[in-house]
Amino acid sequence: MHFFHLYERYKHRINQKLFYTLNQLPFQKSSLLKAMKYSVFSGSKRLRSSLIYSTGDVFKVNITTLDVISTAIEFIHSYSLIHDDLPCMDNDNFRRGKISCHVKYGESTSLLAGDALQSLAFNILSNSFMPNVSNLKRIKMISELSYSIGSSGMCMGQNLDLEAEKKDVNLSELEIINLYKTSFLMRSAVRLVYFSSNNFSKSILSILDLFSISIGLAFQIQDDILDFKKDSVKTDNKKIIKKHTYPLIIGLDESRKKIKQLHKKSFLALNSLKKKISIPTY
């Protein structure tokens, strides 16, 4: 099957799981639930879920387990975007062509919606049925995710990003910001699948880390390019000056070259993985 069709299948599947999970919660008519749903279904590409299901195919992880992991990761991702957009953070009024959660539902409700999605993610990972996943594996998965989004991961990335607004930043510093802010959640998504499998090898884990981090950074640069193009046509470019991005620091052409380099890294990682295990061909 062509990967595009597989991607669409994965995207449809996780959207159904997210919809079902949120609809099972109490207080469906509350502004909190409405804000949570609004943010989760605001046009996400579900890239992290696609990586989860694809990695699960490689390591023969039960689809039910992959559903649990994908749901948890997508809720974490949505929570992070809600908080990123808040006036005290990036102060963005739009997200994926729609008004941000805090503009539609207010800051206090948006803050709570992000908090609720984060706690829901861990509740799902803690309590949902995952075939052949022992309690020891489950604890390892929870530990991995909590580490990757806290002060040693995503939250630190956001903090570094906020601090960077006050000074000049070089390419190396920008890569560190995006490593923590974006790539660590991507890495965690792939790691959770591997930790839930019946395999474990430090060498394979290192390959998976290289692959997922490279994909995460490439995705961030592409996002920066798209934002740069959109913001460049606007008369008010204060945000462009305020935020440090790849196009601003190294230019559009070098940013595109950087994406190609990262794609090459990710493919080399997959080739290394092929030498150790059998990988499905799409």
Curated annotation (Swiss-Prot):
Q: What is this protein called?
A: Farnesyl diphosphate synthase
Does this UniProt record's set of keywords contain Cytoplasm?
yes
Under the GO molecular function aspect, what terms does this record hold?
A: (2E,6E)-farnesyl diphosphate synthase activity; metal ion binding
Instruction: Look up the EC number in the record and give it.
Output: 2.5.1.10
The biological processes this protein is annotated with in GO are: isoprenoid biosynthetic process
What is the species of this protein? Buchnera aphidicola subsp. Acyrthosiphon pisum (strain APS) (Acyrthosiphon pisum symbiotic bacterium)
Q: Does the keyword Transferase apply?
A: yes
Please give the catalytic activity noted in the UniProt record: isopentenyl diphosphate + (2E)-geranyl diphosphate = (2E,6E)-farnesyl diphosphate + diphosphate
Kindly list the positions annotated as binding Mg(2+) 2.
84, 90
Q: Which sites bind isopentenyl diphosphate?
A: 45, 48, 77, 96
- Tell me which family the UniProt entry assigns to this protein: Belongs to the FPP/GGPP synthase family.
